[in-house]
Amino acid sequence: PEDIERVASVLLNEPFAEAAAKTAEIQAARGLALADVVRQLCEYVFRLHLPPKARARLVSEMADVEHRLAYVTHEKMQLYALVGAFAAAKEDVVKAAVN
């Protein structure tokens, strides 16, 4: 759980390149597979205070990443997709706050 909170914090607060690099570092240091990270992040996302549309989109994109990982797609590419999903969620949160 502590590692997942760190990953979530990185994904929500760091720019794209740094988020990808730091997430990969955490995975390597802790021996975490990306599929396991995605599954645990999904549970974590439901505890966050996100606008419903942002949460729905993020969870949907995370499910897509998990699905692609199940079919042995390139893990680094899926890491970038995960980082992109969180980047889009950050934009959705900003849009919701402005409206």
Task: Describe every region a protein language model picked out.
Residues 1-4:
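Long, charge-dense, solvent-exposed interaction surfaces that engage phosphate-rich ligands
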Residues 7-99:
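Helix-rich C-terminal "collar"/helical-bundle subdomain used as an assembly and partner-interaction module
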